């Protein structure tokens, strides 16, 4: 049986939090089979990342979500492409340079909040989650929830990909530091079940 030449090529060998995994799948022949991408994490756990049909010799894949520190640890990861009996490997490193990667589901909640479908108290739980996970920090604990109405505009921009996670995270951090946003001491964050599948 003929085995095509295959290669997986990353656009970068290192990524920061908030950036999206971006790579090309190159095949010498389209066989009609699917390509399967596996990822091995920093402690050696291997899982299936993606299965995709191949219809041309070169396919670009950009992850729908950026890396965040809740799911993705700093360190080295390996990608393995399997296609029609052929295998190609490459690796990349996640580097914590201080950039902020906010979990993708917070953006979904932001859209609900900015459209008036979620009350401030519920959105504050998402902010509390970011504090609990040390994505942002809450130096002063207040007793009363305060989120200024104008902050919805910034959140709307971020939820619609008009500003980056780092810019939004830094804006949020500034508002907390300046006590413009106050999260009460008894505010509970969302419980996130650890997932065995990587979301990317």
Where do the model's predicted regions map?
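Short, aromatic- and glycine-rich surface loops/edge beta-strands on solvent-exposed regions
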Residues: 37, 72-86
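Aromatic/hydrophobic beta-strand junction motif of beta-rich domains
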Residues: 21-29
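Extracellular Ig-like/FN3 beta-sandwich strand-entry sites
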Residues: 20, 32, 72-76
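Short, compositionally biased P/S/T/A/G/V-rich stretches that sit at domain boundaries
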Residues: 1-21
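Aromatic sugar-binding surface patches on proteins
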Residues: 55-66
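Fold-core signature of tandem repeat domains
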Residues: 105-113, 118, 123-131, 136, ...
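Edge beta-strands of extracellular beta-sandwich domains
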Residues: 49-52, 76, 86-97
């Amino acid at each position: 049986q003929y085995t095509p030449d295959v290669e997986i090529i990353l656009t970068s060998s290192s990524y920061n939090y908030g950036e999206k995994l971006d790579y090309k799948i190159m095949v010498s022949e389209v066989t009609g089979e699917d390509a399967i991408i596996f990822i091995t994490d920093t402690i050696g756990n291997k899982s299936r990342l993606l299965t995709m049909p191949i219809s041309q010799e070169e396919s670009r894949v950009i992850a729908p979500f950026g890396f965040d520190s809740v799911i993705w640890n700093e360190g080295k990861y390996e990608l393995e492409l399997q296609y029609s009996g052929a295998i190609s490997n490459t690796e990349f490193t996640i580097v914590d340079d201080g950039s902020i990667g906010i979990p993708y589901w917070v953006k979904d909640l932001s859209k609900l909040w900015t459209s008036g479908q979620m009350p401030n108290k519920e959105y504050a739980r998402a902010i509390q989650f970011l504090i609990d996970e040390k994505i942002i920090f809450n130096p002063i604990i207040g007793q009363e929830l305060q989120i200024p109405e104008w902050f919805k505009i910034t959140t709307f921009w971020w939820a619609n990909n008009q500003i980056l996670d780092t810019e939004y995270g830094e804006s949020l951090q500034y508002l907390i530091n300046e006590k413009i946003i106050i999260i009460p001491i008894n505010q509970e964050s969302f419980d996130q079940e650890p997932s065995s599948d990587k979301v990317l």
